């Protein structure tokens, strides 16, 4: 591992540790490019500097621990996404703007920026001035990366606002599909599979921890230790 790769992995793990603490997890000191994660006074898993989540089967033997593990996986995936972009993102230079803001996405009249702080990366969207030398009308999302991305797609014109579902709406759709699958005894096997696939697609659009009830996570998405 070269020094640049090692430094990037440490930054990812440090940022992930901040996010996990904000979500109620306990983390131990980083050791050998791995971040130990604890939940309810017990070791839950480890996150590698490359983003893999490693766990022991006996540590996730209940629905609650499986949900907690899925939350860690979602957090690691999200953090890995924006930290990889941030690593090579250009500085946002705008008249009157001070501080370390880096361009994560830039399209049309809108820009999405990340701002590294001691409390983790903070996210904001702006609209460019007509000459693209300044920005205005900032929407600040603190650590909510998913919300910042949704706002950017609308402000940039990539997606019309009416075409987007809010997380609460998606969660309601997910639970409605789950209710139909559980209660409708007349469902054919094929129709049930179609609804299961639709639930998976809807669940994939939801931000971390948006669902309070979910199926046990697929082990195929995790790395066994």
Predicted regions and their residues:
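Short aromatic-glycine-(Arg/Gly/Cys) micro-motifs in beta-strand/loop hairpins
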Residues: 49, 112-138
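Short N-terminal "domain-start" leader segments
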Residues: 82-122
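Long, continuous compositionally biased terminal/linker segments
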Residues: 39-68, 75, 81
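Short, structured interface segments
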Residues: 72-84, 144-160
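Short Lys/Arg-enriched alpha/beta "domain-start" segment
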Residues: 1-27
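Non-Sec secretion/translocation targeting segments of pathogen effectors
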Residues: 217-225
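Charged/polar low-complexity intrinsically disordered segments, enriched in acidic residues
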Residues: 161-212
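A short, exposed loop/beta-hairpin motif centered on an aromatic-Gly-Thr core
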Residues: 5, 58-64, 133-146, 160-162
